[in-house]
Amino acid sequence: MFSNKPSVNILTSLLVAHGVKHAVVCPGSRNAPIVHNLNECPPITCYPITDERSAGFFALGIAQATDEPVVVCVTSGTALLNLAPAVAEAHYQHQSLIVVSADRPAEWIDQLDGQTLQQPGALAPWMKKTVTLPDLSPLTSHYSPLTSHLSPLPWHCNRLVNEALIEATDDTHPCVHINVPLNEPLFDFTVETLPEERVIRRYAPATDYSCLPQQLLDDLQSAKRPLIVFGQLSPRRFHYEGIDHLFSHIIVLHEALAPFTSVSPFEEVLTPHSSHLSSLTPDFILYVGDAIVSKRLKHFLREAEDAHTWRISLTGEVEDTFQNLRGLVVGDAEAILQALDSKFSPHIPHLSPHAVNYRRQWLQLLSDARQQLDNTPLTFSEEGAVRLLEQQLSSLISPHTSHLSPHSSHLIPLSVHYANSTAIRLANRYAKGHPVWCNRGTNGIEGSLSTAAGFAAAVLSPHPSHPSPLIFCVIGDLSFFYDQNALWNTILPRLNLRILLLNNGHGAIFDHLQGLGQSAAHPALVAGAHHTTAEGICQQCGVSRQVATDLEQLQKGILWLADAETRGPRLLEVML
């Protein structure tokens, strides 16, 4: 029988799953549920040591003898601090200790309660990873992995333990700290079996990307509904050459921030009331790149609870965006996909008919969505402005200049920076044929215009006779005025920076938040309503400016803005 504490059972299950075999345990009441569970697990041998200072070094000796990570479990308070000498020594010897400390509930820290101190980070200088598990006590009576989707807390707990144990079992043998806050009562041992928890594995094939994990290949080949998803990825670092088999047989969803020459209009496919959602739900997901803009796509993929999800990551960090991550392959995305393509191609004749039909269904729905967008009447609106700009840019782009050549270091002749919120979401509908840049790492309001200006400065031609590339920035009013000092510099007059300013007098993104419209604070206090224009800013900074107040002016203004025969900064302000 095991403890009734869900966090303790998740921890115990994952310790066993990650192959931990040795645990040094110290006496105490707060850590008793953890010690009890460790003792109940046949794969784990427990060694009782009373003095925590000695226990840490005892665990170090086991790690030296076995070359395996070793748990050392202590109660709350200064018991944790007594491990510092041993942990420091283990750190410099590259011996992995998994420090598991019980803790009091967060609300009782620094409240003069017994055996309480700030435990998270107490051993941070010698720890590769420190995590504090969430309080799962509200779920004590009914937790199981089958019901974990009802609350984000079990997923969070599972992910944190996986993160720590992935590091602890790494070839570099670091130390990690797992802090476990526990509420009373502590001594209820009535759970018959440990939960079968999701295990996340990390694979680092170093430079030999041909040695991909077999499980990844097996999951892909056996999938009936395989899906590849691309997030933000620099076009300078990915050219999708040598990946023809994968991309020709597996459906790929991507936004404007991915290094492709068009976008997938999946937002229009994944509408809440779509009758296709259940048949489109993938059973295999390969996630490449960084941030994804679409909330709808993220929600859709989080609903695929049983999907075998793999992530290609340059850093190796556990980024469980869809809450169903199983495997993490560390390295260069293009090289890994090329290796996967090579291993996948012999199995194409044996691809499941379900997988073939799944791709065909997606392609048809995406084609219908694109046709619907293209047939929508053009209006004087934010959407109309972006649509007209992208149409005009298409006429400026040749097949030879639409993306970076992987075999040269030439600067691209045209790039478009989209600010966050409404602007980048419109790019996901209409951008095509050119790289799209956006500060999506943190998704902040600040810096979009400054980033575009810096980009324009970096690609400025050193020869007056050679025209510099056109660099566009599509930006909303709040983001523009917030970052207006991007235009306050001496190099600006030389930049071919072209700004499409969508000025609707407030943050339009707030209009789409359900329920916010009922608040009296919405227009002025939340959405930042204003009556400001860019006229004065353009005058003082030497930026040519035109204004569009109707569709005809907008059409003429876009032609003026995208005129490649002229030089210098220009701004088209669309007054909506």
Q: At which residue positions do the language-model features occur?
A:
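Glycine-rich, anion-gripping cofactor-binding loops and their flanking helix/strand elements
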Residues: F230-W310, V318, G433-L460, Y482-N485, ...
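Conformationally flexible catalytic loops at phosphate/diphosphate-handling active centers
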Residues: N158-E163, E167-S222
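Thiamine diphosphate
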Residues: V100, E107-P120, R429-S461, P467-L576
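Phosphate/pyrophosphate-binding active-site segments
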Residues: M1-F2, S137, L301-I397, I412-T422, ...
